[in-house]
Amino acid sequence: ENPAFKNYSLKDFTVDVLDQLKAVDIEEYLEYLKVYDTTDVHTKETKQVTNSERGLFRKMSALRSFYNYFFKRQIIQKNPTLFVDMPKLHDKAIIRLDTDEVAKLLDYVESCGSKLTGQALSYYNKTKERDIAIITLLLGTGIRVSELVGLDLSDVDFNNNGVMVTRKGGSQMVVYFGEEVEKALRNYLETYRKAVTPLAGYENALFLSTQRRRIGVQAVENMVKKYASQITNKRITPHKLRSTYGTALYKETGDIYLVADVLGHKDVNTTKKHYAAIDEDRRRSAANVVKLREP
């Protein structure tokens, strides 16, 4: 806490206070935000709050925007936030499934019924083909979970083996799939989807929940987590399956522009940032490709 404002209540703060703060005050505030105690106004309980690199970055961005608003309008004379460096953001390692883990996951979803009994077995048998189709589609195309749950029956084209997805921003694009995805989708449509009568308004939805409505994002996230937790300690989400696909495609083709296009990245630099580590592996392996002398 800044001792100069220790006895201030919220109503005591005016715009003039902004001119009193210095860059060192902002730096001390950022340091404070890393770990601090706060008291719940209702329960009066004290708990510890921490902020990650991204949390600190967001708060500093908000503070800069706040100061810029008053500074540009000449309401205040100083902007100390300009003299404080933005918190550094370190790239997170991409979490994805290895090739053997992909096979284990699909095998597990197809056969785990032998380990279940009672109600759990009944639920599994009911949703098995749907779950296999969803996980296979995510792994085989790299589409976002939001794109998957938005698919309609009419979006699937078996003549060209593609699905019409609605990307971020509303643009549409055909994403193509292979034989494994085709087989999983056909099995689902002939079993679970054909056996379920959708509720009114959901007749066109490709993937249905057990409540006969369009399946939701959270339901897919929970389903992926349920199966993946049985074959790996990694925290696997639908987005991690997307990363798994992107990694596999890049390793096979080495074409970052193709990967960016298929994944629906508007900026190829986004793709480059995510798969830079793979580039490093490729460069390292290249060191042994050229032989200076015959052994």
Language model region names:
Residues 1-295:
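Conserved catalytic core of the tyrosine transesterase superfamily
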